[in-house]
Amino acid sequence: MKETADRETLEEILDLLDGMGMRYWIDGGWGVDIILGRQSREHRDIDVDFDGEYTDVLLKALEDKGYVITTDWRPCRIELSHPLLGYIDIHPFVIAEDGSARQADPEGGWYDLQAEWFSSAVFEGRKIPCISAGAQKPFHTGYEPREVDKVDMQNLDAFLKGQDKL
């Protein structure tokens, strides 16, 4: 099993998602790197937040590429793995007309997500939907941060401080 999701895999997943015509945003470590405009570290997986109405269609597309479900915590998240492409962690959202969204939490409640948290950034010449710089901190809560999460937040803090000086 491939233990990292590299830049080529990210491009392949982005092409798949773009071809589906659904709303999605890259989250997690790759989401931070997209905001930074550079890859700062290796990534275990690609986190994808998406319009939950496409859950079955997205799962079929991923399974058709050879991914298999390894963790199924529906409706919160589904993790899939591929022997050559690594891991992808998909998070179905319920998207409101105003652009805000909700994600089911594991205890049966909901996380409420503000419309302005959904953004995009340019990474290697490609405009990619992602969770905004300001929303990355709330998205990195609710669990014990790993060392890579702490580094991601430090990199994001440095990036945001640089933006304040522009």
Locations of the language-model features?
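Conserved catalytic core of two-metal-ion nucleotidyltransferases
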Residues: Y67-A101
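Anion (oxyanion) recognition and catalysis
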Residues: D18, E63, V122
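Helical scaffold of the NTase/Pol beta-like nucleotidyltransferase catalytic core
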Residues: M1-I26, Q154-L166
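Catalytic cores of NTP-dependent nucleotidyl/adenyl transfer enzymes across multiple folds
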Residues: Q103-L166
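Short amphipathic alpha-helices in soluble, non-transmembrane regions
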Residues: L58-D64
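Active-site nucleotide-donor binding segment shared across nucleotidyl transfer reactions
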Residues: L14-I46, D51, V57, S132
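Short, acidic/polar N-cap/turn motifs at the starts of alpha helices
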Residues: L14, P75-I78, W117-S120
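Short, solvent-exposed loop/turn segments at secondary-structure junctions
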Residues: G31-V32, I95-A96, A135-K137
